[in-house]
Amino acid sequence: MKATGYAAALAILLALLIAPAAATAVPTTPQEIHDVAGDVLAEEIISFMDAEYCGGRGDHFSRADLADASHNFPEYPRRITDTTGKEITIVRPLNRIVAYNSHWVTPLHQEDKVIGVANSGVRAAVINPYALEKIDIGGGGPNFPDIEKIYECNPDAIITYVTLGPGDDFFVDKMPSSVTVVRMDYLEPSYLRDEILKIGYLLDCQEQAAEYVAWHDRYVDDIKQRAAAIPEDERLKVFIDVGASGGADRRTASEGQYMHAHCTDAGGVNVAADTVAAKTGVVNTEWIAQQNPDAILGLCYAGGYETDDPTALADHHSDITGQQILTFTPAAKNNQVYIVSYRYAYGLQYPAALATIAKWFYPDRFADLDPEAINQEYIDRFHGVDYDVAEHGVFTYPDTR
């Protein structure tokens, strides 16, 4: 760093040391952003000088990053903790992003910052048409992308999943250290909202993130509050089915899996909440019948906005109702076996799916909810495409439209 760079950094440091400490929540206002930038920059200047002059060995900005951070202050540096718990700090705007996870791109209107997308994002181009103009890096979800295609993008950041796809041994180890790797899912209801606020702050699109969060809270908070008021003795016992596991075994969701959250947020009681050690596990149909569920909520890994073919969801429904031992449960007797597409149940559109589930469970209590209208509002406001959810897409079985 040149002498003028040191002088600028020291001048900033002196000013920052007498400023009040910033709050720990995700910054949303200009003042909060500037306050956090001040705290981070002061910390990094001290760490750099400790390493440079006192033999310190702690992590710190490089000379180039410290110069950029000082130059871009007070809008930068920006710091978040991603969903893996890793601290992410940037010192300049991110403008060349590979979106291996692209759930956030269109709703936050960040298409221009994206250079490459996973093939799964390209397949969803019916509601994300920008994806057709980007480099297809392959992969998506659990499938690995093409590393050469990622190099072709020359990214300054990769935004990927926590629970799906390659780990750091792929994205971090194979990329230059200058490439920021951020891991967020935008899937789990328990932390999707916070992830949107964090990525909005990191990419300087706080207003768009706040707009989505306000829309999300409008529906989710209302459903959860109304469901919480249902007396315990009136709550439906629900078995969550996430597919066959061979023979008479079914795979189910326990506490910590997003379908469990949907079930409980809608007022249901997950009969397998404490039965399996992991987020998902296997139980026998005889055990399911013994729980005598009032409803069965199935998750099908098909459907969504990009197809009009309901066959996979219908087959999943038939697979459950065809289990002879389950025909004696209240769920089967009262026609309360429901299937929801995972492309509807997870992701930023999930408030519409939650409304669907709540209305399935308690049609009288949630008679005023219109899940189809919520889904259409999501498409209109956050994707801005000509797409009629009443005519296209496969979201549930039986089809509630």
Regions found by a protein language model. Name each.
Residues 83-85, 135-148, 276-285:
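Short helix-initiation/N-cap motifs at beta->coil->alpha
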Residues 1-31, 48, 54, 61:
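Secretory targeting signatures
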Residues 65-105, 207-241, 366-401:
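Bacterial Sec-exported substrate-binding components of ABC uptake systems
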Residues 108, 164-170, 184-198, 231-261:
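Extracytoplasmic ligand-binding site segments that recognize negatively charged/polar headgroups
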Residues 188-201, 210, 214, 221, ...:
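Structured C-terminal subdomain patch of bacterial secreted/periplasmic proteins
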Residues 96-153, 157-168, 268:
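A short, structured surface patch at a secondary-structure boundary
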Residues 33-73, 147-152, 169-178, 311, ...:
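Alpha-helical segments with a strong preference for the paired helices of cellulosomal dockerin domains
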Residues 251-279:
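Alpha-helical, coiled-coil/dimerization segments enriched in small aliphatic residues
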